[in-house]
């Protein structure tokens, strides 16, 4: 058996100084997919985008919800809004070339997209993406005392 070596490099990014995690405390419980839920999400997104003067990437797990929120905000946001409905390098390039832009995205924009510098100063994640369970992860989940302990240990490290 070969020896495995590991090297963990320090990040040049100072997370403590440069990041803020915002979790709204005033979220109401709404029926999933309801108009009330969509309006509540749109209101929070509107406030956050305006407080950062654009420069925002808004990630959704649902194209349907993304489209509804986009439609609600398109005339309300004072910054250029760009929506990526499927993998669209053209729209991502347009976002990179547009000052103070806001990019609404789902699917392919969750991984492998680079926005260097201050192009994105605010990242809004509407809902965390959870992968479709597979037999191995299901068996692993059963080794935990509760679903909450599994989520805290594996899903949200």
Regions found by a protein language model. Give the residues of each.
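Short coil/turn segments at secondary-structure boundaries
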Residues: 6-9, 61
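Structured helix-beta-strand junction loops
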Residues: 51-52, 76, 98-99
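Well-ordered alpha-helical segments embedded in enzymatic catalytic cores
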Residues: 40-47, 68, 90-94, 108
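Conserved interdomain hinge at the start of the Helicase C-terminal
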Residues: 22-61
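Conserved RecA-like P-loop NTPase helicase motor core
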Residues: 12-20, 24-36, 80-82, 86-157
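Segments forming glycine/polar-rich beta-alpha architectures that bind adenosine-containing cofactors
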Residues: 1-5
């Amino acid at each position: 058996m070969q020896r495995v070596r590991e090297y963990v490099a320090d990040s040049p990014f100072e997370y403590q100084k440069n990041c803020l995690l915002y979790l709204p405390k005033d979220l109401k419980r709404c029926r999933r997919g309801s108009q009330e839920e969509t309006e509540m999400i749109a209101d929070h997104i509107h406030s956050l985008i305006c407080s950062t003067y654009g420069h925002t990437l808004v990630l959704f797990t649902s194209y349907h919800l993304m489209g509804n929120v986009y439609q609600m905000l398109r005339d309300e946001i004072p910054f250029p809004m760009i929506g990526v409905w499927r993998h669209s390098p053209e729209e991502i390039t347009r976002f990179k070339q547009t000052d103070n832009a806001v990019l609404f995205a789902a699917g392919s924009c969750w991984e492998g997209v680079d926005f260097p510098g201050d192009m994105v100063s605010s990242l809004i994640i509407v809902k965390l993406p959870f992968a479709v369970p597979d037999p191995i992860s299901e068996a692993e989940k059963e080794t935990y005392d509760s679903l909450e302990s599994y989520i805290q240990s594996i899903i949200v490290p």
